[in-house]
Amino acid sequence: MTVRIALDAMGGDNAPRAVIEGMLEVQKKRPEVVFTLVGIESRIRQELEQMGVEEDGFRIWHASEVVEMDEKPAVALRTKKDSSMRVGANLVKENQVDAFVSAGNTGALMATAKFVLKTLRGIDRPAIASVIPAVGGETLMLDLGANVDCSSEHLCQFALMGSIFANAVLGVRAPRVGLLNIGEEDTKGNEQVRDAGEQLKARSATLIPGGSYVGNVEGTDIFKDTVDVVVCDGFVGNVSLKSIEGTAKMLTHYLRGAFTKNWKTKLMYLIARPALRCFRDEMDPRKHNGAILLGLNGVVVKSHGGADSVAYAHAIHVAVDLAEKQVTKRIRDAVAKFRAEGTQPSDPAV
């Protein structure tokens, strides 16, 4: 199956070099993927020439403007209609590509994607979702910052989209969905979370197709083999994600310090090096790069702004997976099914 992926060649701290290198890395493993580099053509060609790369297996699509990393989303949306970000989203809308990847300004990407592609019918707001490494596998977490305030209906919609993603992309046959809360008891949390819990419990068969609602989960459960999808609002999700990233960096720092204290610890490092390399690879944030904007009429993946070629390549692989497994269509079909039955994810529980 040929998959067409558009890349924002201007987005991110290391663009366009990291974008091109990431693309070339994916081409080695997936030669059937066809790429479109979107951005200022002269800058892209100059970079390709410096790298000694010939135009093969990809095309260049000129976009005359660039959204800066510190630019306000509303300003970018209003004034930069020919930005690489806007053009990339339009290519998805016009079905010229199957997915779009950008390491650019997160707020501007969300605003642009929502404006151009619109949300799926029956989904009020898109959510940022990402896969977190966990014991025995992986956990999908959403929302990670798109929506600071969420109603119970929004949380239920996130649960629906998350369960479909877990099944289609992560291969979880019966996704277990939990609401991130300050305790496991049904009485814990704010009103929105409590109401969402009641709806998910009453309608898990329709809101979590083929899966189950396991109730409230705490922060420690994210890494356990007890839940496959963790649902929360964007404020809680973003704080949790940054805490996870900070903890991983702290562990790496402590381990490095412990093994470089003296000649004895350095000798111990030589013995433990194979195991430590496995640990490092598992915890490497570059290999978990690629957040998904779920709920749009098209596939959009957000790469970390500081991504290098390894991290960017992983974000591309995420986009290819989403396109191949038709996650957008699956979510659309699930919501359509609810509407045909006279209900939808935003309806109150009955």
UniProtKB/Swiss-Prot annotation:
Pathway: Lipid metabolism; phospholipid metabolism. GO terms for biological process: fatty acid biosynthetic process; phospholipid biosynthetic process. GO terms for cellular component: cytoplasm. It comes from the Bacteria. Coiled coil: none annotated. SUPFAM superfamilies: Isocitrate/Isopropylmalate dehydrogenase-like. InterPro entries: FA_synthesis, Phospholipid_synth_PlsX-like. It catalyses: a fatty acyl-[ACP] + phosphate = an acyl phosphate + holo-[ACP]. Keywords: Cytoplasm, Lipid biosynthesis, Lipid metabolism, Phospholipid biosynthesis, Phospholipid metabolism, Transferase. GO terms for molecular function: phosphate:acyl-[acyl carrier protein] acyltransferase activity. It is found in: Cytoplasm. It is an enzyme of class 2 (transferase). Its EC number is 2.3.1.274. HAMAP family: PlsX. Homodimer. Probably interacts with PlsY. Belongs to the PlsX family. Catalyzes the reversible formation of acyl-phosphate (acyl-PO(4)) from acyl-[acyl-carrier-protein] (acyl-ACP). This enzyme utilizes acyl-ACP as fatty acyl donor, but not acyl-CoA. This is Phosphate acyltransferase.
